[in-house]
């Protein structure tokens, strides 16, 4: 595994796409497009086929063509509308983990326990799995039926791939990326990671499951990481209660006000350097535990395997793109198509929670890796 000396965000390269939205989990498909999830935004009005919605989209998928700064977002008309609604937000989901395998695209959408604006202790407690067999032209539920956005009362383990699991684990999912069309995968498994819960002490623990790539729709095929052996190989179990922690992130970066939201990673195989690269973030809280009270934590880690062991190679306890002390950056996403041929520069997408435009949008910045 390549030895990394340092990493640097290149401030002069910050690119803001316009439009609005956040989170930006993405995958690189066989058609050479990246497919990206948007949450809570209007998208890009200049897109062909764009239809403005009064309150915007709760969650949607778009395609991306090109390289920064010359990129174009592509509207996918076949994605079922999931709109931001007035309270009580009857159909609210958040599209996060995504993976392209051949002509199929799979996406995990996280479900809260109830609308964030009503009821006590709002938090993410599960995930719905949908998929497309034709690179985003049409979409199906996990059971093969047309996508239906179940309202709160209708969500159950019959239609959610995870729901109210032990410790509320596997509610914020990230799929490990391995190049265009998953081409760098060698063992036939898809790897998915997540925070282990919703409170300090569990949310900063990383857990993982794997599934054969042809059986990702079958919850019964999932194996959960238990531990690493001395030789670096992993123990797996079909019992979610036997899960172990892949890695533990620093304490003190989980909010207690509004819904807990932190330590939701991005993991991508960097083929030129022969290592897995992870970006992750912690929530900057004020003295009362309110989210976005100060700049976020940003870190990068590397590992020889998806299950680690993970070594930290970069840390910022005040993540401030362009040196802006008002920045409230979050959800760093390693863009899998935008890794250079030598693996050293790559592009990192993120959102900034500052209310003014153009920061609440698809921002990206080049990051430079220095090696020995």
Task: Report the location of each language-model feature.
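Beta-propeller domains
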Residues: 1-17, 27-90, 109-154, 294
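Structural signature of eukaryotic scaffold interfaces centered on beta-propeller domains
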Residues: 16-31, 86-106, 113-115, 161-188, ...
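Short glycine/acidic-enriched loop and turn motifs that connect beta-strands
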Residues: 41-46, 112-116, 197-201, 283-287, ...
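Long, hydrophobic, well-ordered secondary-structure blocks that form the structural core
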Residues: 102-210
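Active-site cradle of extracellular carbohydrate-active enzymes
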Residues: 144-160, 186-305, 314-320
